[in-house]
């Protein structure tokens, strides 16, 4: 019987795709990795709902922080990561837990701005300025650290996972209704998570 591999979602900006693909290749034999541009978002669908579904069906998330944007804070310009990648990290932390999310970013001496809420999370850093421009080799140490973390993976209990997903959906959807009455009407028209 083949060992079940963990499912990993890899997020990045368009500019960070080369690093995302390199990580996917480096983890090929350790996990089933899907980069965000590989059929994650269905045509005519709601991006946020696709991301929630992907998070619920992932065991881990890897978030490639490439510093593509600039931000001005108190008259100082700094490089910063694309905001949607930070949002996706937060979404995944909320659904699969902080221990199952990895930040991968280039080592840099430049003025880099990260949201203060991420202070204390240790990112995996790589040398993006290698003389030979070998991105896979640069990302190798980060990928090896992720592989070591994956050794503790055990497939989740499917029934428990499904029940938890349903509860998360019910809780999350309740925030979108303006009144308890609206939510009650919605709940009356959908299958109960308690049945």
Model-identified regions with their sequence ranges:
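Residue-level detector of alpha-helical recognition elements and their boundaries
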Residues: 25, 107-108, 161
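Conserved N-terminal substructure of TIR/SEFIR domains
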Residues: 1-61, 95, 178-195
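Short, surface-exposed, charged/polar-biased interaction segments
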Residues: 29-31, 44, 48, 72, ...
């Amino acid at each position: 019987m083949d060992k079940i591999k963990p499912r990993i979602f890899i997020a990045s900006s368009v500019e960070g795709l080369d690093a995302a693909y390199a990580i996917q290749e480096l983890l090929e034999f350790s996990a089933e990795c899907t980069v965000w541009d590989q059929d994650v978002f269905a045509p005519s669908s709601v991006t946020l709902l696709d991301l929630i579904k992907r998070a619920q069906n992932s065991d881990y998330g890897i978030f490639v922080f490439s510093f593509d944007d600039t931000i001005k804070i108190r008259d100082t310009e700094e490089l910063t990561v694309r905001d949607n990648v930070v949002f996706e990290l937060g979404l995944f932390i909320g659904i699969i837990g902080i221990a199952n999310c990895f930040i991968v970013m280039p080592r840099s001496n430049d003025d880099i701005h990260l949201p203060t809420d991420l202070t204390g999370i240790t990112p995996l850093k790589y040398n993006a300025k290698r003389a030979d421009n070998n991105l896979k080799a640069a990302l190798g140490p980060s990928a090896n650290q992720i592989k070591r973390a994956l050794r503790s993976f055990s497939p989740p209990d499917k029934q428990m996972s499904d029940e938890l997903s349903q509860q998360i959906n019910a809780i999350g959807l309740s925030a979108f209704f303006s009144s308890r009455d609206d939510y009650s009407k919605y709940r009356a028209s959908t299958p109960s998570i308690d049945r």
